[in-house]
């Protein structure tokens, strides 16, 4: 519902949680509190319209925002009400994980807050981009981003379609505590799109919002995967990446697993496994190149 006058355009949108936001002009002082929305907004709006990125912007292990882009925006902010208010934003983009107190306080002051969910698959990711594009008044640009994603994915699919189904490899991805990638979560979707069989999906119940299931060593042994995908993001300086590699290689529980016997332990950056933007296509390509280098 767009009514135009010489001075302003009024439009309304719904965020991912169904809350209605009304704008009388395109937002020009945007604060993004999540790394995924940093990345989406960077392709939707001129950086002059961004007053702050999330705290991870420019960290190449988790964010696709370059150091140059982070410097151009010049400010990073966490879920801190005072820090956000100082920036005088006309739109704050948050996630369902953002503190409810912060969201409420911003709304009470009259600052629009757009909340995104975490997509579980490609369709939901495209919807996230399309909806956010509408919120910042850039629907056409949103469509262009999605078209580019579709094209890149199609080209990748052409390469991967040469692989007979019996040659698909089974992979299990790990974070620093255990195996990950339950059926129905985003990593499961990414592996499937890369023509990789997600070992963890076979032994876990589908994702539900409330239950987190630990994938045990015994489950991993039962799966007997061809490849282990290991993490490399040392987010709190306490993770020993190389040490974790040796720990898994030398774990007696895994000694008969194909991945260990054939030394197929590969590192995949967390910016791919926890992707939350149009870069999902980069994640699919990264996994495919890691598991099937011979196709590239």
At which residue positions do the language-model features occur?
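Short, low-complexity disordered leader/linker segments with a strong preference
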Residues: 1-23
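Extracytoplasmic substrate-binding proteins
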Residues: 9-10, 20-22, 101-180, 201, ...
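Short helix-initiation/N-cap motifs at beta->coil->alpha
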Residues: 16-18, 71-82, 119, 205-217
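A short, structured surface patch at a secondary-structure boundary
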Residues: 29-87, 91-96, 196-199, 209
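Short secondary-structure boundary segments
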Residues: 34, 96, 118, 231-235, ...
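Short helices/loops that flank or line small-molecule/ion binding pockets
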Residues: 80-88, 108-109, 214-224
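His/Asp/Glu-enriched short active-site or ligand-binding loop at hydrolase and phosphoryl-transfer sites
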Residues: 186-209, 267
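Short, surface-exposed loop/helix-turn segments at secondary-structure junctions
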Residues: 235-251
């Amino acid at each position: 519902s767009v009514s135009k006058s010489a001075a302003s355009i009024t439009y309304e949108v719904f965020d991912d949680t169904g809350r209605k936001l009304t704008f009388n002009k395109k937002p020009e002082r945007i604060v993004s509190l999540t790394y995924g929305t940093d990345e989406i907004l960077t392709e939707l709006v001129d950086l002059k319209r961004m007053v702050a990125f999330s705290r991870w912007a420019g960290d190449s292990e988790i964010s696709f925002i370059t150091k140059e882009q982070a410097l151009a925006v010049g400010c990073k902010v966490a879920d801190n009400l005072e820090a956000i208010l100082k920036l005088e934003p006309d739109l704050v983009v948050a996630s369902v994980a953002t503190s409810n107190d912060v969201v409420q306080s911003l709304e009470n002051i009259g600052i629009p807050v757009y909340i995104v969910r975490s997509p579980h698959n490609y369709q939901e990711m495209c919807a996230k981009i399309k909806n956010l594009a509408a919120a910042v008044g850039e629907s056409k640009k949103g469509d262009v981003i999605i078209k580019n994603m579709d094209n890149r994915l199609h080209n990748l699919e052409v390469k991967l379609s040469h692989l007979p189904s019996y040659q698909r490899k089974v992979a299990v991805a790990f974070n620093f505590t255990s195996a990950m990638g339950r059926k129905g979560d985003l990593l499961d979707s990414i592996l499937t799109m890369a023509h990789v069989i997600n070992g963890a999906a076979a032994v876990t119940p589908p994702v539900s919002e409330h239950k987190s299931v630990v994938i045990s060593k015994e489950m991993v042994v039962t799966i007997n995967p061809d490849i282990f995908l290991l993490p490399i993001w040392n987010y709190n300086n306490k993770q020993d990446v190389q040490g974790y590699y040796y720990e898994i290689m030398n774990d007696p529980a895994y000694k008969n697993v194909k991945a260990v016997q054939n030394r197929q332990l590969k590192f995949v950056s967390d910016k791919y496994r926890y992707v939350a933007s149009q870069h999902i296509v980069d994640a699919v390509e990264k996994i495919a190149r890691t598991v099937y280098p011979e196709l590239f």
